[in-house]
């Protein structure tokens, strides 16, 4: 079974294989973005239209990943194309203030009013880096509390306990907390300023904030745990962090780079942080990052004040990204968010039903237009649960991913699923059918390698390929 799935993929994608070999002559392993590589080689994409992408062999796929949540409007949306092509004739990055900076900011503040003041950078990585620097400058403290398995980009502190294999470890500051696990290349001295806490564990957060509160500059959290498994925050968890950070005099930072598509989360649920980061959708398909929040905190950057915090960058707030982002925000409001919520709810319900119908233990998690699929009968509550659900199942997950590609669906190897606003409900249903067929076909493999995933009392049904 495993061999047939791989052979079908390789038979259909010889041009991608050739492209991968050529890329490897310039790029390590033929890759420049770790999340998009998978064995035996990734598809090389040459054209995108609407909700579909075409590979180098001419095959079209329904895009169910939306560039890891960075896109919302589909590919080549007419308004975004017009904004970018028009701005190209007026200048891309002129090296001085432009009206687009406050025009885009006004649009974004209308969507997220907690951004009383904001600044621009080039990515979510930069945005979270600057949010923490802002918190440290404002509080005069150094310690940062982050979620074990939380992903905040590729700067040094963001790569501590970020669901990547560590080269070395360090003990936690307090007993009972996760050990500190910096990724390769991150200094232990950097990791020494990080305290990791389990997601959705308010007692652990209370222990840290009450025990180390006077040293803590910020608590940084994703409202939905992203790379750590798509885990939603438990009811009351983020409100509890809000209360605890106020008591400790620390700033609460929401990393909403991925969860703007949910409303953003803070607006939908009414829990307001001190600082927020955004990226992905706000750039309309081009690189753009935002960090901002309380006016008194962001006043540290006011250049008319004595000794402002220095923040610069040749492409921060560049005109091209802001033009695309403004067009994207003009077409991203209540109706679009509600449609993404509808698609996500439909997808998760369908995936759970599909797994049950073929007698395979599998559960979907997520919120709104952000979903994950996991093997196992119980959905994860934190990143440690996600790690346990994935342990020893890398080949199974790879085979499921390749099966979906063979069926014409572009998804993420680690299970992330995101839709575009123009994605049709029928496309979601077709993806659910593809999952069901793939899981059915994988039952013999699962019976040999992962029998614990077969639900023996479930009367699975035969599924004919569409």
Description of each model-found segment:
Residues 1-466:
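Conserved N-terminal phosphate-binding loop of PLP-dependent enzymes in the Aspartate aminotransferase
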